[in-house]
């Protein structure tokens, strides 16, 4: 059964991450890496027709449908393990000797629309959702976000939109991006991995007009 475990448990499954990648995350709050996951077509085929559900948030905030996957999910399971193992390498860039891997990862599918600016560590404003967030370490404990894009090979951000917009250099606690000193739009190129600091980088998914598929993993601060 899937459970929260130290990311080091999956270190052997992680793709090779260089010291330069770790240094870039530490200095810039994000890093973009291409070519680490050669099995994108296989993953897309396994996830494209799966059942997805609405989130608990309003479609005025986000329009994606999601499903959760674990290391026990067939073809996808190996990639889930690989994403969980990334935390062991990147932990020093977010100020920890080690971080914990979540029990599950999230697949987000957009047919159209996007996701308003937010922090992955930001509590929701709705009271009921806030208490759910507060009681869930897998939400309130996030320190590191890793996103693997599984878009179609001919997805073109210039035509279809769907970029991940990162608001960089923000003051602590800014979930809106208003204090950003720079903005970076990352195209959802298939096989591209984006890693950023969950508590430092407000971000948004810009509107897409074509199906956009991504697999996300949130690493957690270790329990005190």
Regions found by a protein language model. Name each.
Residues 4-94, 106:
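Non-heme Fe(II)/2-oxoglutarate
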Residues 17-19, 132-133, 201-202:
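Eukaryotic intrinsically disordered and solvent-exposed regulatory patches
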Residues 24-26, 137-142, 187:
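Extracellular/periplasmic catalytic domains that process cell-envelope and extracellular macromolecules
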Residues 45-46, 120, 208-209:
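Short coil/turn segments at secondary-structure boundaries
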Residues 114-122:
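Histidine-centered catalytic micro-motifs
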Residues 142, 151-224:
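Catalytic core of Fe(II)/2-oxoglutarate
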């Amino acid at each position: 059964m899937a459970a929260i475990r130290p990311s080091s448990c999956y270190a052997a499954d992680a793709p090779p991450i260089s010291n330069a990648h770790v240094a870039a995350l530490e200095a810039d709050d994000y890093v973009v890496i291409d070519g680490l996951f050669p099995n994108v077509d296989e993953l897309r085929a396994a996830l494209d027709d799966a059942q997805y559900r609405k989130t608990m948030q309003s479609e005025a905030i986000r329009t994606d449908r999601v499903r959760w996957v674990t290391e026990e999910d067939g073809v996808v399971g190996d990639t889930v393990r690989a994403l969980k193992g990334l935390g062991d390498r990147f932990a020093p860039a977010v100020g920890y000797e080690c971080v914990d891997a979540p029990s599950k990862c999230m697949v987000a599918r957009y047919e159209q629309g996007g996701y308003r600016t937010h922090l992955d560590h930001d509590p929701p404003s709705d009271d009921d959702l806030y208490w759910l967030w507060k009681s869930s370490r897998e939400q309130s404990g996030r320190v590191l976000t890793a996103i693997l894009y599984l878009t179609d090979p001919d997805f073109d951000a210039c035509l279809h939109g769907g970029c991940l917009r990162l608001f960089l250099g923000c003051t602590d606690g800014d979930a809106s991006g208003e204090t950003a000193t720079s903005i970076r739009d990352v195209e959802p190129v298939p096989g591209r991995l984006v890693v950023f600091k969950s508590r430092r980088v407000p971000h948004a998914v810009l509107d897409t007009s074509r199906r956009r598929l991504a697999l996300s993993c949130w690493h957690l601060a270790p329990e005190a």
